[in-house]
């Protein structure tokens, strides 16, 4: 059985997917920051060698003696691939926004990603393109899971200052952060933040914020609105510089935050209508790793609409965890 291996190595997790040349998903794996034994790294825990290797092995264990013709992905280097497979297996670097556009069958359009990090990418019908943000948590990642998590930590820190700052997030945020330091006899939120925690840990708090926003907490709701507004500002910059405000193009929303938070997505779409009324917002119909796999098959000259449909259907059926809406 000849296959391709697709890898989506993000800030908090790594997805790996084995697909046959006919488009059938036959093996998949995921390793996230929340799992014991996952790796850590300054470029994002999902891109660490340990995390990538664990996700790949999970996927490969399900396909036995399959022949891997090519490995395609982003957030992972060719040296990591060759270290596992040797020089005989080809490596195809894929850009994250291309995988998102592939999922909706578009060559031109806008991709807005809000996961652990954040960016907006645009490509017009004339081929002119622009990629903004993805600068990391210190310089950018506006509207990202990290951005949301940091606002949640700050809200928890000042929740007791005055009744107007009260939020149901306070105790759950402290508990979530302390869980990342299980061997500490006494946990201090100040010490935790001064210890430069992994950005994936901070981004994981976005899930808490969304849950408390849905439960009615005003502070949590405002955090989501603020984050969505920030991503919309990046969208405005891209659309304006490329003169795409009135173009009828897809706006593909992807990343755990954009696809996992109803409130965030709805507010972002409302802002999109104000900024670029011609754009058509749509959430990515499947995990980005499926887009990576499709691009790998396309690069081999064997991808068409039937292969795409088969790939997406088999991914959605075979990997419910991968297609889940975990934020961050």
Where are these regions (language model features)?
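ATP-binding/phosphotransfer module of carbohydrate and carboxylate kinases, centering on a glycine-rich
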Residues: 1-66, 104, 108-110, 154-328
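Phosphate-binding/catalytic loop of phosphoryl-transfer enzymes
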Residues: 70, 75-169, 316-328
């Amino acid at each position: 059985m000849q296959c391709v291996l697709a890898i989506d190595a993000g800030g908090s997790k790594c997805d790996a997917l084995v697909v046959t040349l006919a488009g059938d998903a036959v093996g998949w794996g995921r390793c996230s920051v929340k799992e014991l034994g996952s790796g850590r790294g300054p470029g994002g825990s999902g891109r660490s060698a340990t995390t990538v290797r664990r996700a790949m092995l999970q996927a490969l264990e399900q396909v036995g003696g399959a022949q891997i013709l090519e490995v395609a992905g982003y957030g992972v280097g060719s040296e990591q691939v060759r270290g596992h497979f040797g020089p005989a297996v080809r490596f195809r670097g894929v850009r994250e926004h291309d995988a998102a556009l592939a999922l909706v069958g578009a060559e031109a359009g806008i991709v807005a990603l809000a996961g652990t990090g954040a960016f907006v990418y645009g490509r017009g019908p004339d081929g002119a393109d622009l990629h903004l943000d993805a600068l990391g948590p210190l310089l950018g990642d506006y509207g990202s899971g990290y951005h949301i998590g940091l606002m949640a930590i700050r809200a928890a820190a000042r929740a007791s200052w005055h009744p107007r700052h009260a939020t149901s997030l306070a105790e759950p945020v402290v508990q979530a952060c302390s869980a990342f330091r299980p061997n500490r006899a006494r946990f201090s939120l100040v010490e935790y933040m001064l210890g430069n925690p992994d950005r994936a840990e901070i981004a994981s708090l976005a899930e808490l914020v969304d849950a408390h926003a849905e439960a009615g907490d005003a502070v949590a709701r405002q955090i989501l609105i603020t984050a969505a507004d920030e991503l919309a500002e990046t969208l405005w910059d891209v659309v304006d510089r490329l003169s795409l405000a009135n173009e009828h193009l897809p706006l593909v929303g992807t990343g755990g935050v954009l696809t996992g938070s109803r409130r965030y997505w709805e507010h972002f779409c409302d802002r999109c209508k104000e900024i670029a009324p011609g754009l058509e917002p749509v959430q990515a119909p499947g995990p980005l790793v499926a887009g990576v796999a499709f691009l790998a098959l396309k690069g081999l000259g064997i991808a068409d609409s039937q292969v795409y449909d088969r790939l997406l259907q088999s991914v959605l059926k075979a990997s419910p965890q991968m297609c889940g809406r975990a934020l961050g």
